């Protein structure tokens, strides 16, 4: 289940990740006219110009084990793509009319209100599904948007109501689903939610958005499977010791936030939605698509960062609904450090933090050698005593 966002030359191999998440900006995928790097694609009698995707295909082939050095698919990794929509003047028609405010946020909600935009996305998702549906360049998990309930920060939607937002998102989700599934029936499609479960810090609460989305999907396309890409950061984001937070993250669906401490609330709630909507038990899958803990290099936070990454991984490892645990960054991000977040396994000068070797060995026979020294830090006598179903014999990765 161990994963990382992005690809780092040398370190992707060394850490031994089994899951890799990549971001794709849809604004880079579309051109309004023929130009270098874009290819014509005719769909339902209309010709569009979409990015050739050569570089991304090469990356995904490498991750799937089909690069020139390993032509027989060795060391295959599961690839997750997150599809985002930034602002480009000439492509503003692809952004929902209520959200067309340049500079309002990093990413915007898609336009399902106007026919030209809908047709473009339908064609684009079919094109991408074809390119990334072959077993050599297969994308296993597709996520539409980033933290879509956070509609004032990551999925800007202007003044749209919750029901309008969820319905518009679900319509785009259905287009992506059909585009992906027509080529790769085993690939999964995910909704992205932040850690605000009942709190609405930057838009709507995750639970409210999920409920609206699930209801709309059931009413309009009940046969479609959907899954959840969750970001269970601590609250606040700078808190590493998630295990001792008894205020923001509590037991029960009434909790304000969901972190790795109480991630079971999410997975149990999804089980209840399966029952409500007649879905097969266990069919709604979860990936932890973004997570990180902060540590300035050389400071004591290195210990809590390492402990948190490992403890969280163990929790995910023994939750049968969670398929992946994907950490935010190999290297501290300059934009994030300006906000006090040092989420990388390295600092900007490639100083290796303690978390690097811990994370590297979490799914090996040496896992406990690296994690047992942190038992006292997290206040546990053993991992079995704090993690239901913990079995050290199941920690080493298989089928890698």
Task: Set out the residue ranges of the language-model regions.
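Boundary/entry segment of secreted carbohydrate-active catalytic domains
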Residues: 1-28
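Conserved beta-strand positions
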Residues: 4-6, 22, 144, 191, ...
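Aromatic-rich peripheral "rim/lid" segments of glycoside hydrolase catalytic domains that contact
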Residues: 38-40, 134-138, 152-153, 163, ...
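Noncatalytic carbohydrate-binding groove/subsite architecture in carbohydrate-active enzymes
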Residues: 118, 140, 165-299
């Amino acid at each position: 289940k161990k994963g990382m966002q992005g690809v780092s030359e040398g370190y992707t191999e060394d850490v031994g990740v089994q899951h890799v998440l990549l971001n794709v900006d849809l604004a880079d995928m579309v051109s309004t006219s023929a130009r270098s790097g874009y290819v014509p694609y005719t769909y339902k009698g209309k010709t569009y110009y979409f990015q050739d995707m050569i570089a991304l295909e090469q990356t995904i082939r490498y991750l799937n084990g089909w690069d020139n050095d390993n032509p027989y698919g060795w060391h295959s990794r599961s690839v997750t793509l997150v599809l985002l929509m930034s602002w480009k003047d000439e492509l503003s028609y692809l952004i929902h009319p209520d959200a067309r405010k340049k500079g309002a946020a990093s990413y915007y909600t898609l336009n399902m209100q106007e026919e030209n935009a809908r047709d473009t996305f339908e064609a684009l998702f079919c094109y991408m599904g074809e390119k990334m549906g072959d077993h050599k360049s297969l994308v296993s998990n597709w996520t539409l948007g980033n933290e879509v309930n956070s509609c004032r920060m990551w999925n800007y939607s202007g003044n749209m109501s919750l029901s309008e937002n969820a319905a518009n998102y679900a319509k785009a989700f259905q287009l992506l689903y059909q585009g992906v599934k027509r080529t790769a029936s085993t690939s999964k499609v995910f909704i992205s939610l932040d850690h605000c479960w009942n709190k609405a810090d930057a838009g709507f609460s995750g639970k409210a958005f999920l409920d609206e989305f699930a209801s709309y999907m059931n009413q309009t396309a009940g046969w479609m499977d959907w899954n959840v890409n969750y970001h269970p950061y601590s609250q606040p984001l700078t808190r590493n010791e998630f295990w001792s937070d008894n205020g923001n993250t509590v037991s029960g669906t009434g909790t304000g936030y969901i972190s790795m401490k109480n991630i079971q609330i999410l997975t149990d709630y999804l089980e209840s939605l399966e029952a409500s909507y007649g879905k097969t038990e266990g069919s709604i899958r979860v990936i932890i698509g973004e997570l990180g803990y902060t540590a300035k290099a050389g400071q004591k936070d290195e210990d809590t960062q390492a402990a948190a990454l490992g403890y969280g991984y163990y929790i995910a490892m023994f939750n049968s609904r969670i398929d992946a645990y994907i950490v935010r960054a190999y290297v501290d991000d300059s934009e994030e450090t300006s906000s006090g977040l040092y989420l990388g396994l390295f600092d900007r000068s490639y100083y290796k933090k303690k978390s690097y070797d811990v994370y590297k060995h979490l799914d090996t026979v040496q896992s406990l050698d690296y994690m047992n020294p942190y038992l006292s830090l997290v206040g546990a006598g053993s991992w079995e005593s704090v993690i239901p179903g913990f079995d050290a014999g199941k920690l080493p990765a298989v089928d890698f």
